[in-house]
């Protein structure tokens, strides 16, 4: 009896493994066929290519944890530079650049996830991939992140874009001959990138890519407030925020004590983020992050790369009606991919999001040449 059960389990595992090896998905695309974005999307080969998720990452949590923490990073050591802001704050940006790269090379600016930087897998591998393809890559670290000195009370959030704009203009001044510039954001960074698509004026950004935007921030936070998700995601992210506060000399011992009690983002955002922004509470801040009202205001070609199994979001929240009214926004979705991961093939040498992002930028460059 036990032997029969074990045999059935073994056969089931074999069939499941074969199924995973052969599994592929055709990405779904949502965009206005009459809009400016259409000519870019229709030119992209990667948007029509089947996505083969990594067989052994067979659920959204494995994909996400692998993509955020376990994929590792390249051995490349980027150049670091401090950028200073008008209010006395600063951030440390990093350059991923090939030797003898011409000044005319396109620039890819990357905004990391919450509390991350070039040390996180998704940011590091995207930067390395673009660098190998002759882009000058700039990791736009936020205040307090990636080893940046904390020199102001204000830290980072997913709405204000003035720090990012300062970094972009600083790099633009250093490399005025660069013909094309792109902005890529992951998770919280994608919220900043999307907002920059509305706020940008003098930066000449040619295209924006937003990877794993939660779409509905408040609802997304509720999704990860389950016991399992709290252990898998919430605790490490909250610890990252708390570590920044611990290092800061701009918060009193009483404030720090209160912040350390928090177990969810709302607690932190009520005390820190909302107050630094001049808002009353976290709810006001989360409302500013909602994507739906922004879609028709974005004025730069912007591609959202989204996985339907993202543990921080829900495909039902995709603002399809607003996308059809926009000239500049497209959504590319996959059945699998987790949050910021999109691992593909057995070894995942290049993730699906990396492949799509480069293709998107290259198509824009080609179109602009004509």
Where are these regions (language model features)?
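Alpha/beta-hydrolase-fold enzymes
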Residues: 14-37, 173, 177-178, 182-277
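Alpha/beta-hydrolase active-site loop
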Residues: 154-175
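Short beta-strand/loop motif that positions the catalytic acidic residue
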Residues: 298, 304-306
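Active-site nucleophile elbow and catalytic-triad environment of alpha/beta-hydrolase enzymes
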Residues: 271-294
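Catalytic histidine-centered segment of alpha/beta-hydrolase-like enzymes
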Residues: 337-350
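N-terminal cap/lid segment of alpha/beta-hydrolase-fold proteins
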Residues: 56-100, 343
